[in-house]
């Protein structure tokens, strides 16, 4: 999904005028302050979210007695809700005149509200409702946040900018399970204590967003290449958002994101398999996401910068090849703690080579005024596909067992990667114009 950008970007003066946080005659900042502020918000929010994510599978399966099929249904429905809301969030942000912060703030606020409500969720219906609202918040904020990153960064540096943001986000993912582990070990309230602390951290993330992220980002990042065409006075309509799929480059990205999403096992299922195959004690389960997050953090920025210089789509496909190797290790006769660590290394490398890559690629083929909707379209396709994968994998696990279900998924991933390589082979990163969208 990282698409190579080898074109020249014009004179130094043009660059300085187009990119925020720069002065004429000086080299523009590779990572604008807006990206760093959004990274701080994501870091804090991810500490809160990953505290819950780290204990949720065991809480649902061991605490509430839900079967793998039931957990797959719960996980899939929640991802599906977030996917459907994501499109609305991106469109509303664009329609408001690029007021992406307002929509993103609503999303962060909803998620923060849900954390203390988990204290009341001791039955499956209540838990499902709370998680659905939490996913609604995540769906609302994702596209506007990525649109702000795209608009604040010059095209040649988007891979690095998204890499920095994802690295900060992953720092939160790294700290969240550690904090959950510490809370579980230090308190007698167990899961309730984790949910309470998570809610307090989420509120802090909302405060950082309100205080440090600018309300409106006016810089047209695509002006680095050429002056932007005159934009119509009317706000983008919903049909304009759907009409983005007329753009062949965006359509290819969406198709491939969905195709590969259909064969990407959710983290929760993968960690459950690792815990069972590696015979890990239950209290170590929250540490499994830690290994993934650690290598994601180490590699996100260098791989993002590499994608800016080489090819975003090739790096994205290579990342799925790494994931396929991870599936192979889980299915291999090699078990125990070393095998678990090796799988987590590959899993983290997969995320470093793919997460944020899709957003960087999307930003390069969508007009500035449609950034929110463009990010939402591709993200929705991917999330809906992962929703279907969670349902199918949970059913397959219940029918055939976890190992057989993973073997089938791995074979499907290999086929999907080959097809995606063919579809993306001619993809180029040339931003479309508003006229092309409305045509």
Task: Cite the ranges covered by each PLM segment.
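Juxtamembrane intracellular "pre-TM" segments in multi-pass secondary transporters
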Residues: 5-32, 216-256, 434-439
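Helix-loop boundary and gating motifs at the non-cytosolic
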Residues: 25-79, 250-288
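Transmembrane alpha-helix termini and helix-breaking/packing motifs in multi-pass membrane transporters
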Residues: 58-63, 175-193, 388-404
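Helix-to-loop junctions at the C-terminal end of transmembrane segments
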Residues: 85-98, 184, 298-312, 397
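Structural signature of the two symmetry-related core transmembrane helices
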Residues: 102-116, 199, 314-329, 410
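Cytoplasmic helix-loop-helix junction between adjacent transmembrane helices
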Residues: 130-171
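Symmetry-related core transmembrane helices of the 12-TM Major Facilitator Superfamily/SLC fold
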Residues: 192-211, 404-422
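C-terminal transmembrane helical hairpin of 12-TM major facilitator-type secondary transporters
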Residues: 313-357
């Amino acid at each position: 999904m990282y698409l190579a950008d080898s074109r020249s970007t014009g004179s130094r003066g043009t660059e300085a005028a187009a990119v925020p946080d720069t002065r004429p005659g000086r080299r523009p900042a590779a990572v604008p302050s807006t990206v760093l502020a959004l990274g701080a918000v994501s870091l804090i929010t991810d500490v809160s979210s990953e505290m819950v994510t780290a204990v949720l599978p065991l809480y649902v399966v061991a605490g509430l007695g839900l079967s793998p099929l039931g957990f797959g249904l719960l996980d899939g429905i929640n991802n599906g809700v977030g996917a459907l809301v994501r499109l609305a969030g991106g469109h509303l942000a664009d329609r408001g005149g690029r007021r992406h912060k307002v929509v993103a703030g609503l999303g962060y606020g909803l998620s923060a509200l849900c954390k203390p409500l988990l204290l009341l969720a001791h039955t499956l219906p209540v838990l499902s409702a709370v998680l659905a609202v939490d996913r609604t918040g995540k769906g609302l904020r994702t596209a506007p946040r990525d649109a702000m990153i795209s608009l604040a960064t010059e095209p040649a540096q988007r891979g690095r900018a998204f890499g920095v943001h994802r690295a900060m986000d992953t720092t939160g993912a790294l700290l969240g399970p550690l904090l959950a582990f510490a809370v579980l070990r230090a308190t007698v309230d167990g899961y309730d204590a984790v949910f309470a602390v998570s809610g307090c951290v989420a509120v802090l993330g909302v405060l950082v967003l309100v205080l440090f992220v600018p309300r409106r980002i006016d810089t047209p990042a695509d002006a680095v290449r050429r002056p932007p065409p005159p934009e119509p006075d009317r706000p983008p309509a919903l049909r304009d958002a759907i009409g983005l799929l007329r753009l062949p480059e965006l359509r290819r990205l969406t198709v491939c994101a969905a195709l590969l999403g259909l064969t990407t096992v959710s983290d929760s299922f993968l960690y459950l398999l690792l815990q069972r195959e590696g015979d890990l004690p239950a209290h170590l389960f929250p540490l499994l996401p830690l290994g993934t997050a650690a290598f994601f953090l180490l590699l996100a920025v260098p791989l993002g910068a590499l994608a800016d210089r080489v090819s975003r789509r090739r790096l994205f496909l290579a990342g799925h090849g790494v994931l396929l190797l991870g599936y192979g290790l889980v299915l291999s006769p090699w078990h125990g703690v070393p095998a678990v660590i090796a799988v987590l290394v590959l899993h983290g490398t997969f995320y470093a080579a793919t997460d944020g890559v899709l957003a960087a690629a999307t930003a390069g083929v969508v007009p500035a005024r449609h950034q929110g909707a463009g990010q939402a379209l591709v993200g929705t396709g991917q999330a809906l596909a992962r929703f279907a994968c969670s349902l199918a994998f949970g059913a397959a696990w219940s029918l055939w067992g976890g190992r057989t279900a993973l073997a089938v998924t791995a074979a499907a991933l290999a086929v999907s990667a080959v097809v995606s390589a063919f579809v993306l082979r001619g993809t180029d990163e040339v931003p479309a114009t508003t006229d092309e969208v409305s045509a």
